[in-house]
């Protein structure tokens, strides 16, 4: 039997500042998240992009067949963060059996993120469901199969 190598990642919290995000977007719980990021967590995630690049090299070196990311690409779920995360994660999306993802709570941080569909716009291609009859809310939960079935 062949071995399938799976790389699972989560909680990369990529951000590159908040260019183009209106100040009014922070007059809610994002201001608390921004303060937490600025005063406590920013150093933890300071090299997140470089770590994702290293993960891509590791994935290729180890021959990962499938890459799964279970969310929290972002810190505050803004559209620029999600777009930036999609750009940085790109090298991981080419595994032979594919790349599969679901958003984390930080990716859907506030109602504006969900209503605007920012995560779906940037990552929707990786969340398709292959068994739609089991979905209960549109395409949720996304169900994917990989490899062979008995």
PLM feature segments, named:
Residues 1-81:
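N-terminal active-site segment of His-dependent metallophosphoesterases
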Residues 84-150:
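Extended active-site neighborhood of metal-dependent phosphoesterases/phosphodiesterases
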């Amino acid at each position: 039997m062949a071995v399938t190598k799976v790389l699972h990642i989560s909680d990369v919290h990529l951000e590159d500042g908040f260019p183009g995000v209106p100040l009014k977007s922070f007059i809610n719980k994002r201001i608390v998240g921004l303060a937490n990021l600025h005063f406590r967590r920013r150093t933890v995630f300071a090299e997140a992009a470089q770590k994702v690049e290293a993960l891509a090299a590791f994935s290729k070196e180890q021959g990962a067949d499938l890459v799964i990311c279970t969310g929290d690409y972002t810190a505050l779920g803004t559209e620029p963060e999600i777009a930036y995360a999609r750009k940085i994660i790109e090298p991981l999306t080419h595994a032979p059996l594919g790349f599969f993802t679901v958003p984390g709570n930080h990716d859907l941080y506030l109602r504006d993120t969900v209503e605007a569909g920012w995560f779906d716009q940037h990552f929707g291609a990786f969340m398709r469901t292959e068994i739609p009859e089991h979905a209960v809310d549109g395409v949720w939960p996304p169900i994917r199969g990989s490899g062979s079935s008995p």
